[in-house]
């Protein structure tokens, strides 16, 4: 396999070229717009440029399936270069045996599945890389990556994302970038503890289908599928609106979102029990809105997991955003001057988010709705489950 050393700028240029070939530009734009509607990133913010800046800070190398070449940063020290080489060689082997290039292709509306592929690929490569690093640091001990406690490993990855120039990136971007490395590796470690690398190979042969299965090994062992969830409708917004993007975020996406409003453990609890979800970004001229329906598995009763998640998210929003303008037992809403209304509701096993509408004109963002309209929209959403 050929290898090429590049400076950081040239390495990122290669990544940009790869992304431009694999991902339509509107996919990146729509992802950023949804994050802005949630309030996770500023309204005046170049999301794509910020993503590449964060990558430039973190990226040491990458394997390009299109030409079978490994590209590495030329400024790495010996230890970092050895670790990066080990990591990227695993990606090359994944491509040779399981056609990583085909599995990694962008598929509209299958965001959760894309995260599964990323988590399995990065978890496999990161686990092997840590084997190499531990063997170098503690030769002759026989220790491997699976001897690291899960919380210690996860904290090492998070610390790497929170240091250096990338530490200034919005929290949601850093946690999203770290997620496949953390949770994918924990999944791989769980497999290795059960059956060694053969168990990991079996996961490639019969891969997880949801990030819920990545986060909970027992869900993969049981082959528990995602529930079918219909896409949110938006007639309550009026005429002229159209779908810009429709996707599933998965349990991992829900956990990452909830961490913006609460501590990680609470976010894990609130997203646990995820059964399925569907979100839709809609636009009308320069106006935008987003709705997201998250359906929960049954617990002791049919709806108790959704009820607990709703209560936890409501408390998180109260703490982060302040008191709601409207607060009913199953509906809360805040009016935001620069992002439009933010409504949260629960109906049965569903927790529903309705964000916007908001005007996104170049002169500045401004609300284009209110909580009365949001209540109508939520009634439409819970009536069309």
Where are these regions (language model features)?
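C-terminal soluble interaction/assembly domains
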Residues: 270, 275-385
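Post-HExxH zinc-binding segment in Zn-dependent metallohydrolases
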Residues: 95-101, 105-154
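Pan-zinc metallopeptidase signature
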Residues: 161-286
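Short pre-active-site segment immediately N-terminal to the catalytic Zn-binding motif
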Residues: 68-86, 113-117
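Catalytic zinc-binding patch centered on the HExxH motif and its immediate surroundings
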Residues: 10-26, 46-67
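Active-site recognition of the HExxH zinc-binding catalytic motif
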Residues: 83-100, 125-126, 188, 298
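Acidic helix-start/capping segments at beta-turn-to-alpha-helix junctions
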Residues: 1-20, 108-112, 144-155, 206-210
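Structured segments of extracytoplasmic/periplasmic soluble domains
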Residues: 18, 62, 73, 92-96, ...
């Amino acid at each position: 396999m050929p290898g090429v050393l590049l400076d950081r700028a040239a390495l990122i240029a290669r990544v940009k070229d790869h992304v431009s070939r694999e991902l339509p530009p509107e996919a990146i734009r729509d992802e950023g717009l949804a994050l802005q509607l949630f309030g996770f990133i500023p309204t005046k913010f170049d999301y794509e440029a910020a993503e590449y800046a964060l990558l430039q800070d973190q990226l040491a190398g990458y394997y390009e399936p299109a030409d079978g070449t490994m590209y590495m940063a030329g400024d790495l020290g010996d230890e970092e270069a050895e670790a990066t080489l080990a990591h990227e060689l695993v990606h090359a082997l994944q491509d040779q045996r399981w056609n990583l290039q085909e599995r990694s292709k962008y598929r509209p509306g299958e965001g959760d599945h894309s995260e599964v592929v990323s988590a399995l690929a990065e978890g496999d490569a990161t686990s092997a890389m840590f084997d190499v690093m531990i063997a170098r640091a503690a030769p002759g001990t026989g220790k491997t990556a699976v001897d690291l406690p899960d919380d210690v490993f996860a904290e090492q990855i998070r610390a790497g994302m929170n240091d250096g120039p990338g530490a200034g990136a919005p929290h949601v971007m850093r946690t999203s970038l770290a997620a496949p490395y953390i949770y994918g590796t924990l999944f791989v470690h769980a497999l290795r503890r059960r059956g060694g690398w053969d168990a990991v190979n079996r996961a490639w042969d019969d891969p997880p289908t949801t990030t819920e299965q990545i986060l909970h090994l027992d869900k993969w062992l049981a082959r528990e599928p995602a529930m079918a969830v219909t896409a949110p409708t938006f007639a309550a917004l009026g005429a002229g609106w159209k779908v810009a993007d429709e996707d599933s975020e998965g349990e991992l996406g829900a956990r990452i979102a909830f961490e913006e409003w609460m501590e990680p453990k609470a976010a894990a609890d609130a997203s646990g029990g995820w059964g399925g979800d569907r979100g839709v970004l809609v636009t009308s001229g320069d106006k935008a809105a987003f709705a997201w329906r998250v359906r929960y598995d049954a617990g002791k009763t049919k709806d108790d997991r959704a009820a607990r998640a709703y209560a936890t998210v409501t408390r998180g929003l109260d703490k982060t955003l302040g008191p709601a303008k409207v607060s009913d037992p199953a509906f809360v809403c805040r009016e935001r001057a620069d992002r439009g209304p933010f409504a949260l509701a629960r109906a049965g096993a569903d927790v529903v988010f309705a964000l916007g509408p908001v005007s996104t004109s170049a002169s500045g963002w401004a609300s284009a709705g209110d909580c009365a309209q949001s209540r109508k929209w939520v009634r439409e959403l819970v009536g069309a489950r």
